[in-house]
Amino acid sequence: MEHYEQARYAPAEGETNEPLLSENDQTTVSVDPSLPDDLTRDTVELPSLEEPELARHYVRLSQQNYGVDSGPYPLGSCTMKYNPRFTEDAAALPAAAVHPDRSETALQGTLAVMHDLQDYLGRIGGMDAVTLQPPAGAAGEFTGILIAEAYHEATDGGHRNEVIVPDAAHGTNFASAALGGYDVIELPSGDDGRVDLDALEAALGENTAALMLTNPNTLGLFERDIEPIAEMVHDAGGLLYYDGANLNALLGRARPGDMGFDIMHFNVHKTFATPHGGGGPGAGPVGVTDELAGFLPDPHVRQSAGGDYELYTPPRSIGKVHGFQGNWPVLVKAFAYIDRLGDSGLADASAKAVLNANYLADQLDYEIPLGPFHHEFVASAGDQDAADVAKRMLDYGVHPPTTKWPELVAEALMTEPTETESKRTLDDLADAFNAVAGDDDAALADAPSRTTARRIDQTAAARNPRLSWHDLD
């Protein structure tokens, strides 16, 4: 192993030194003289490796990693479902490999897919108009905040400077509102884990621009008072924003627009399997009611009276939030997923997600203090440290749940198995949970003991990060 780790960066003395780059006849390269010396270098500093060493390096890395193709991934509020390969096939079609700067005439097929995806998402969410431009879920949130800001500026002078966010909301809700220039008002949850109507009434006022909600919330609980909540927000002159993180629990059974939400974003990497991770690209489409459609980003796709598809600028558009029409390959995957499953398939996926969460919860030895829940639940590790539980679960070959959050549950284990796990997998996952629940303190404190990397000193890693192979000893 030590020899292998060394060989990644430089061959041992006497070994071949095969360059990864081909020889170049150009002996000199012009460098911008304005660049400082510490940003220029004489060599590219790539490791010199033979092809077998390089192949083994990446295979070994893949064996040390864990993803949805490795096993269950019950990371709460993340919807880590299996990503079917047919969506990759769709995105790899030659017809999808088009440059966005081509003429509208040459892009009719592309624009047709985008137009239909806008329609699909609008019908799923109960929204009147949808933009596909935002490149990620958080970017979708920020786009929604910009739309709310533009709406209030146009309708009541823009004096509203507060956005209300529940204490159990995703951190991006707080960040998006703050980035939009709003003061964030944190809304305490009730004892049942849901919105406290009295607390909401106290928080609402003439400066309220919006309330951001996830429904079901991060505890997996459906906001049963969503209709009076919507009425209260609207009576105060605010808008109701839907964070689509947990939309997987509602597909085909309920729609945010029907609940009174004015704006929502879709996390296509969660709900529509586009997939997660890898540093992107992503997509965070935003849906709005008809009253807000004129504020959508520029340009938007529509169908002309003659049947052709065209780009147009909404009359009070907030402008661009991303280049061209967003991350096209990701949108193709979302389109393929929705088109393949159809209305009944999406509803079935949602029902199975809720069923799987409830089945798994019923098998666990850990207490689950709040319910009834939908697609996810939050168990309490009790006297155990939730972070230790997570590390110990790695020893049993499964990915741990989200830990320590929401803080409404002590030592929280937020768990979302998704619809793509079988009963056998759920039983194995329950066995892992329960084995950890019965472990002694020593086993928890030492975990993980069966993984390639042992427990990391998180404090030292934060204070002294090693971000390059130059930093290795």
Swiss-Prot record:
Sites bearing N6-(pyridoxal phosphate)lysine, chain numbering: 270
Keyword Oxidoreductase listed: yes
Cofactor(s) the record lists: pyridoxal 5'-phosphate
Catalytic activity: N(6)-[(R)-lipoyl]-L-lysyl-[glycine-cleavage complex H protein] + glycine + H(+) = N(6)-[(R)-S(8)-aminomethyldihydrolipoyl]-L-lysyl-[glycine-cleavage complex H protein] + CO2
A GO biological process held by the record: glycine decarboxylation via glycine cleavage system
Subunit structure: The glycine cleavage system is composed of four proteins: P, T, L and H. In this organism, the P 'protein' is a heterodimer of two subunits.
Designated name of the protein: Probable glycine dehydrogenase (decarboxylating) subunit 2
Primary gene name: gcvPB
